[in-house]
Structure formats: structure tokens, C-alpha cells
Amino acid sequence: MHMNPTPLPHSEDDGVMFASIGQTTLALTEPPSALHATDTLDDVFGSEDVQGSTSFTTEPSDMRRLQSEHTTAGYREGVTVAKAASVQAGFDEGFGLGATLGLSAGEIVGVLEGLAAAVPGDERLAALLGEARGDFSARSIFGATYWDPNGTWTYPVPGQDGGDVIFRDVVEAHPLIAKWRVVLNEQIQNWGVRCDFFAEDQVVDEEVVSQKKLGNPATALKAATSTAPATQSRMSDALQW
């Protein structure tokens, strides 16, 4: 018996293919396109990876989550400990230098403010005061032009190669401090300001404090009252330019 299968016409919409083998007709109910059918929700949730679903997991499902949590916690703890140690060490090292620098800058600006207040009509003093305030702002005086990121000065300091250098040496060598020291000295000479007046009063104050510490209130009061008239006289002379 010779069988010659003859495919019959079919429609692409019915999903059925007919084949004739002799007098027998067979219906193939599974179209080839069924293997590639797509789900309408694949665009939202993604398609299932049939091949990947057969692979076996070599570690528990929570292992990766726990590992990530421990890594994050360890990183935070390390940053916290390192920050505390670094900040304290940096503060201990930089506080003295920063305080000395701020004191010198404040001294220069303060004297210029006093001169500008004593002579309100002088435009030169007003301009110098405004310029000094800009130069001695924290952003300017502590800027990258004069300091490394680690807090070391980048400008030359006299004596730093051969001997000991103290904070005062570093501060007075700062380009902005050196610049305004010259300007301030010129204005002091022009207006006849007595800078030793403040030094003498400081000596008197130190004597009063020392007598109080020694338990001699009467001596401390005598030292304070004996210098009061002289102090007032010098203040009047200094303001009468």
C-alpha cells in the first residue's frame, strides 16, 4: 500500500492543518506558531525564562540580602570611627594656628574700624576697611591659594627650614597679613596712633590679676586706681588728633 500524504489548504486563523494519507485525513491541532506565543503582560512584567528556571540555587535566598546589610553596616561604622578620630586630631592641630591667624586679622580690621569711625569723612579709610574685610573673610584667608587640603600652608615661612617655627611666624608670613600690616602701619603713622597705649594697659591688667590670685585685694585695688587717671588721660590724648 503506497501512501502519499497530501497537505490540504488551511487558513492561518483556524490554527489547524489537515493532511491526507490515503483515505485517512489527519488534523494537526498544534500550529507551529504556538511555540512562540507571547503573553500580553510580558511588556510589563517580563517574560518567563524557561531555560533559566531549571538552574539550581547554590546558596540560601536570604544570603545576598544579609551580605548587603552587613557590608553597609560595616561601612557606616568604619566611617563613623574614622571621622571621629580624624576630626579630633585635625582640631587639635589646627585650632591654635587658626585662632592665632584670626586674632591677627581681627586686630588689623579692628584698628581700621576705629580709624574709620574716628574720621567718618575720610573716603580712603572707608575704602581700606571694606577691602580688608573682604581679604580677611574665611573663604579668602583660608582659601586654597594659601593652604593645602591637609591644612599645611603653601607660602614660605622664614626659618621653617632651619629652626623651630611657631604659630606667630606662620601667621605673620601669611601674604594677606603681611600686606595689611604694611597698610596698617602707614595709616597709624599718618594719624599718629599710639599702639603702645594698649600694651601699657595690658601690663596693668596683668598686675591686677596677679595680685588677686595672690590674695591681696587691697594691692590689686591700689594698682587699678593708681593707673586709672593716667589711662583716661592717654585715651583723651590719643583721640585728639
From Swiss-Prot:
Compositional bias (Polar residues): 224-235
Annotated stretches, region: Disordered: 222-241
Pfam families found in the cross-reference section: Yae1_N (PF09811)
Location of the protein in the cell: Cytoplasm; Nucleus
Keywords from the UniProt entry: Cytoplasm, Nucleus
GO terms for biological process, alphabetical: protein maturation
Protein name stated in the entry: Protein YAE1
Predominant location category: cytoplasm
Entry GO CC: cytoplasm; nucleus
Biological role: The complex LTO1:YAE1 may function as a target specific adapter that probably recruits apo-RPLI1 to the cytosolic iron-sulfur protein assembly (CIA) complex machinery. May be required for biogenesis of the large ribosomal subunit and initiation of translation.
Classification of source organism: Eukaryota, Fungi, Dikarya, Ascomycota, Pezizomycotina
Family, similarity comment: Belongs to the YAE1 family.
Record text on subunit structure and interactions: May form a complex with LTO1.
InterPro entries per the UniProt record, alphabetical: Essential_protein_Yae1_N, Yae1-like
Chain spans, region deca-GX3 motif: 74-114
